[in-house]
């Protein structure tokens, strides 16, 4: 919390003297506005229920029932926090402001023509420039809301419901990944923390929640592919992971860094070599479709960098945000995650040898595997040094992706929503903690205070 306090005090001083941060309540894009709303009773009830019963239910429920319960809880938590600000302010208008995607729905009446012309409207000096968030993302992001509008789900209410509903599945995707790579016990221990994450304050309502879910599912499907027996079904799963990764890159330029976490998943999987060709083939599909339609991803990205530095990105001081962004991360992941990250290094140190491939005898002296040979499946391993080390490596990859994004200088402020896709992969570190109820209580109190004391911009 010292980092958060320093970011708040130093940030207020910089904003008061230089006016260069362009945020109302540093380090968050928010304003001080203590309030309650219709979602307050539900938010308190969900928090109390998860703190009281979450760890026990996570340990006892059948696995599939646990996944359903985690999704339902994450949705209830996110919806209730969003409704603290009321339906109109908390959900319906969040994606309709002058910066957002719903402002450009009518400009996509001819989708192929709009894609061909997309890069001509990114720069601020171009004719009819895109709003900030449209210019800042590849066209799959606005196209999502265009397609929702085309099927009769137009307007801010439906867009908000889409982001919350889909975004809440990110916790399920992370649980699936942790179970396949580090074992079911650790996944069960992580479940209440994923469902009750302070990040829900910004997942409802932000399009980045939707992006986080797509990215998380691309990694979850990859984890399934690299831990399943080789076969046609596994190859199809790897191809599906590639499809989702390709879509992720066309929802957000910065989410190409998900490849860092993907590399960790591949390293921990036993069938990574056989999955790679099908993963690559799937990953090429979405880029090929958009490229053939006339959209140039690389050109658009370079134009975005130019626009970023022509706007607030060129004014906000890197010297402040390069560390204040990490304070934002503490707020969206909570004190429990910070404590869990403190145990990640120890877990890696204790079990680092378990991550290295074991050498087996070769030649005539090699023992025969026999008809009952069994390859260990991490999903069935109990908690222990090896499982904790595998979890620690996965979390470390998430942290590394976040740090690369931070050092890039393309994420100065607003990272409480922009980094949601990375923050989800830090939360499993909470599985390494003892006294889960106390830490869950700390997570809930932090989220409730943030949502009731501040009026967040997302």
Residue ranges of predicted features:
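Membrane-lumen/periplasm interface segments of specific transmembrane helices
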Residues: 3-19, 247-250, 259-260, 264-343
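Hydrophobic, aromatic-rich transmembrane alpha-helices
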Residues: 49-55, 330-367, 374-388, 401-405, ...
């Amino acid at each position: 919390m010292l980092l958060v306090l320093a970011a708040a005090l130093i940030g207020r001083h910089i904003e008061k003297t230089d006016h260069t941060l362009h945020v109302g309540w540093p380090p968050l894009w928010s304003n001080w506005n203590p309030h309650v709303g219709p979602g307050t009773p539900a938010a308190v009830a969900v928090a109390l229920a998860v703190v009281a019963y979450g760890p026990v239910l996570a340990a006892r429920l059948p696995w599939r029932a646990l996944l359903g319960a985690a999704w339902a809880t994450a949705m209830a938590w996110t919806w209730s926090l969003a409704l603290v600000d009321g339906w109109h302010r908390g959900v319906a208008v969040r994606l309709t402001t002058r910066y957002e995607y719903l402002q450009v729905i009518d400009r996509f009446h001819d989708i192929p023509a709009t894609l061909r012309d997309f890069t001509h409207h990114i720069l601020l000096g171009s004719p009819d420039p895109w709003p900030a968030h449209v210019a800042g993302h590849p066209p799959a992001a606005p196209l999502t809301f265009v397609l929702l509008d085309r099927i009769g789900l137009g307007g801010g209410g439906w867009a908000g419901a889409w982001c919350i509903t889909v975004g809440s599945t990110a916790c399920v995707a992370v649980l699936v990944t942790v179970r396949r790579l580090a074992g079911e016990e650790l996944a069960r221990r992580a479940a209440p923390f994923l469902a009750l994450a302070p990040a829900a304050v910004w997942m409802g309502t932000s399009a980045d929640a939707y992006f986080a879910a797509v990215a998380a599912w691309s990694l979850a499907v990859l984890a399934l592919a690299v831990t399943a027996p080789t076969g046609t079904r596994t190859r199809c799963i790897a191809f599906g992971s590639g499809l989702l990764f390709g879509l992720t890159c066309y929802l957000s330029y910065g989410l190409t860094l998900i490849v860092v976490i993907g590399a960790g998943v591949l390293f921990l999987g036993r069938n990574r070599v056989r999955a790679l060709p099908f993963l690559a083939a799937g990953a090429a599909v979405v880029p090929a479709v958009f490229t053939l339609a006339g959209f140039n991803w690389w050109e658009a990205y370079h134009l975005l960098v130019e626009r970023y530095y022509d706007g607030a990105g060129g004014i906000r001081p890197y010297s402040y945000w390069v560390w204040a962004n990490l304070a934002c991360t503490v707020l969206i992941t909570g004190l429990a995650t910070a404590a869990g990250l403190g145990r990640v290094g120890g877990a890696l140190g204790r079990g680092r040898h378990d991550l290295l491939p074991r050498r087996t005898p070769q030649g005539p002296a090699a023992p025969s595997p026999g008809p009952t040979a069994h390859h260990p499946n991490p999903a069935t391993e109990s908690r222990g040094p090896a499982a904790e080390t595998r979890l620690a490596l996965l979390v470390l990859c998430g942290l590394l992706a976040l740090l690369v994004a931070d050092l890039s200088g393309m994420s100065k402020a607003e990272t409480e929503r922009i980094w949601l896709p990375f923050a989800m992969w830090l939360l499993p570190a909470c599985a390494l903690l003892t006294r889960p109820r106390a830490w869950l209580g700390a997570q809930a109190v932090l989220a409730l205070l943030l949502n009731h004391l501040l009026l967040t911009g997302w």
